[in-house]
Design a protein with these regions (language model features):
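Gram-negative bacterial Sec-dependent N-terminal signal peptides
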Residues: 1-22
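Transmembrane beta-barrel strands of outer-membrane/channel proteins
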Residues: 26-30, 59-63, 88-90, 127-133, ...
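Outer-membrane beta-barrel proteins
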Residues: 32-38, 63-64, 76, 106-108, ...
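Detector for outer-membrane/organellar transmembrane beta-barrel domains
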Residues: 124, 137-225
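Repeated loop/turn-to-beta-strand initiation elements of outer-membrane beta-barrel proteins
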Residues: 22, 53-58, 82-86, 123-129, ...
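Residues that define the transmembrane beta-barrel architecture of outer-membrane proteins
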Residues: 36-44, 68-74, 110-116, 123, ...
Length: 262
């Protein structure tokens, strides 16, 4: 609550709230748990975002498992130039990822993004420093991330690294995407994590409009999982249906969800 109040005050002084946009969604997701039972997860999310041209900020509030409203993410920052900005808050990481709405991202590395951080964007380069604990020492960083992306004609390429300061460990990721046409896209993410037994892993996704399909694996088994999903909207209603199939265990993991935006 203290962080939420402080952020609202900061946004007000920055003039961001004068042009704030408030949006929300009601979501219902159906997934299969470890006991092979289908469970339903309901959530309500609110997003308040504003940009005064110089200062910007956002607040995301959602319901938890106890049906309590909690602060999910927040950020406040400044646009230094047209291509450079800096922000602080509980923000998502910048590491290259994959997967669909729920399924996917089975084999590729996915460093934890939990915690407050500072993010700087300078053109095609993004830098993120995640704090260990801002309540005890705001000068102590846990991890440093960097990401670079660019596009050439129909190709988009990217590279990122996650560095853990205490252990000096690095996790690397690279991506390439090819826009076949306006509705078809083929992308591949490759990661390297020396802390894993199988250090190199990949995921390739083919998207055709609302339909997506993927295959993934690692250096021990280059074809571990396949999956597919369909995601679309109808007026203010969004919905998705997808499933993952493990080629070794022959286990199917389905997921589905609907959301209403307001």
């Amino acid at each position: 609550m203290k962080k939420l109040t402080a952020l609202m005050i900061a946004l007000g002084f920055a003039g961001v709230t004068q042009a704030a946009t408030i949006s929300g969604t009601v979501e219902v997701d159906i997934t299969e748990n470890s006991s092979n039972d289908y469970i339903s997860t309901e959530s309500i999310k609110f997003d308040i975002a504003g940009d005064s041209g110089v200062a910007f900020g956002s607040i995301k509030v959602e319901t938890n498992a106890s049906d309590q409203f909690v602060l999910d993410e927040y950020s406040i920052g400044a646009n230094i130039t047209e291509t450079a900005s800096v922000s602080y808050g509980e923000q998502s990481d910048i590491f290259i990822g994959g997967g669909l709405e729920v399924v996917g991202s089975n084999t590729i590395a996915n460093p934890s993004d939990a915690g407050e951080s500072i993010i700087a964007n300078i053109g095609a380069l993004s830098l993120r420093g995640k704090f260990t604990d801002t309540d005890t020492d705001i000068s102590d960083f846990d991890t440093i991330q960097a990401k670079w992306t660019t596009s050439v004609d129909k190709f988009s390429v990217g590279a990122s690294v996650d560095h853990t300061i205490a252990t000096d460990d690095n996790i690397y990721a690279g991506s390439v995407a090819f826009a076949v046409n306006e509705s078809a896209n083929l992308s591949t993410v490759v990661t390297h994590d020396a802390s894993q037994t199988d250090e190199v892993a990949y995921e390739s996704i083919l998207s055709l409009g609302s339909l997506s399909a993927y295959v993934d694996g690692d250096e021990a088994d280059w074809s571990k999982n396949v999956g597919a999903g369909y995601k679309s909207t109808w007026k203010d209603l969004g919905y998705y249906v997808e499933a993952n199939y493990n080629l070794d265990s022959e286990e199917v993991t389905p997921a589905a969800g609907v959301s209403v935006s307001f």
